[in-house]
Swiss-Prot record:
Encoding gene (name): dcd
Protein name, entry field: dCTP deaminase
A GO BP entry: dUTP biosynthetic process
Role: Catalyzes the deamination of dCTP to dUTP.
InterPro entries assigned: dCTP_deaminase, dUTPase-like_sf, dUTPase_trimeric
UniProt record similarity statement: Belongs to the dCTP deaminase family.
Catalytic activity: dCTP + H2O + H(+) = dUTP + NH4(+)
Keywords: Hydrolase, Nucleotide metabolism, Nucleotide-binding
Pathway: Pyrimidine metabolism; dUMP biosynthesis; dUMP from dCTP (dUTP route): step 1/2
Quaternary organization: Homotrimer.
Keyword field contains ATP-binding: no
Length: 184
């Protein structure tokens, strides 16, 4: 597998719609950076958030996740309670080629503040808005800024095309739009 450079990312976004909307050059002035970097793409977080709350003293169960545990917010700044988390989504819609696997890493700006971003890999031929999970590991409230960088996607091109893609097996998160809760 090869890590793909900025030139390839730019070409795939422009000719194949791999990332829409696409920011061709990294934006950094007064914001948490986003756009193309040397070997990745820094995606932005949208204004759509679901913030975890323990109002109903719920148990978190990935097999039977209760939306009652979340409070919906559309805002420019999301405040995550101490030792809690929020779900969000990327501004960008991704269409992953059949011979590419994408991994995601959190932004160091957030990590240095105790905020961890988690995303599972984007599999070959998956498409949709990426649901992001922000964990506030601190004992204080933490801010997430909509419209700014949230995480970096690294594109790994396989030496051969996979036999079965995410689309082939009708993956449960295919084509997701908006913040998407766990599904079985």
């Amino acid at each position: 597998m090869s890590v793909m450079p900025d030139t390839w990312i730019r070409e795939m976004a422009k000719t194949k719609g791999m990332i829409e909307p696409f920011t061709e050059k990294q934006q950094r002035a007064g914001v948490i950076s986003y756009g193309v970097s040397s070997y990745g793409y820094d995606a932005r977080v949208s204004r759509e958030f679901k913030i975890f709350t323990n109002v109903d003293s719920a148990v978190v169960d990935p097999k039977s996740f209760s939306p009652n545990s979340l409070v919906d917010r559309e805002t420019d700044i999301c405040v995550i309670p101490p030792n809690s988390f929020a779900l969000a989504r990327t501004v960008e819609y991704f269409r992953i080629p059949r011979d590419v696997l994408v991994i995601c890493l959190g932004k160091s700006t957030y990590a240095r503040c105790g905020i961890i971003v988690n995303v599972t890999p984007l599999e070959p031929e998956w498409e949709g808005h990426v649901t992001l999970e922000f964990s506030n590991t601190t004992p204080l409230p933490a801010k997430i800024y909509a419209g700014e960088g949230a995480c970096q996607f690294i594109f790994l091109k396989g030496d051969t095309v996979c036999e079965t893609s995410y689309a082939d097996r009708s993956g449960k998160y295919q084509g997701q739009q908006g913040v998407t809760l766990p599904r079985l």
